[in-house]
Amino acid sequence: MNNNVEELLRRIPLYNKYGKDFPQETVTRFQMPEFKLPALQPTRDLLCPWYEECDNITKVCQLHDSSNKKFDQWYKEQYLSKKPPGIVGNTLLSPSRKDNS
């Protein structure tokens, strides 16, 4: 198998992509434009917006949690305070017997 590959490669004519006069000629040097990277910002300046965003998210979460507490307080004052104690306190309400004496 290896011999077949070598024979196949030997049949392919070799050529120089720079032309037949390449070793004597000098190839023109490619001029690449110079580019500059922007200066790096200090880490504190880069992370400051992230810290602010995390603080805002924390505040929104606390506000959401406190709104549930406000609703629970309102529900107790407006609805549960008007119900009989047996319904609110999960105690068994049993009817009392009338004494016909």
Swiss-Prot record:
Signal peptide: none
Impact reported for residue 54 to D: Defective in MVB12 incorporation in ESCRT-I complex
A molecular function GO annotation: ubiquitin binding
Keywords, sorted A to Z: Acetylation, Cytoplasm, Endosome, Membrane, Phosphoprotein, Protein transport, Transport
InterPro entries assigned to the protein according to its UniProt record, in alphabetical order: Mvb12
Membrane topology (UniProt): Peripheral membrane protein
Any GO CC annotation of this UniProt entry: late endosome membrane
Phosphoserine: modified positions: 94
Main location: cytoplasm
Positions where N-acetylmethionine occurs in the chain: 1
Compartments where found: Cytoplasm; Endosome; Late endosome membrane
GO biological process per UniProt: ATP export; endosome transport via multivesicular body sorting pathway; negative regulation of protein-containing complex assembly; protein targeting to vacuole; ubiquitin-dependent protein catabolic process via the multivesicular body sorting pathway
Lineage top rank: taxon: Eukaryota
Description of how the protein assembles with itself and partners: Component of the ESCRT-I complex (endosomal sorting complex required for transport I) which consists of STP22, VPS28, SRN2 and MVB12 in a 1:1:1:1 stoichiometry. Interacts with STP22 and SRN2.
Extra remark: Present with 752 molecules/cell in log phase SD medium.
Function: Component of the ESCRT-I complex, a regulator of vesicular trafficking process. Binds to ubiquitinated cargo proteins and is required for the sorting of endocytic ubiquitinated cargos into multivesicular bodies (MVBs). Appears to be involved in cargo sorting and release of the ESCRT-I complex from the MVBs.
Protein name: Multivesicular body sorting factor 12
Gene transcribed to yield this protein: MVB12
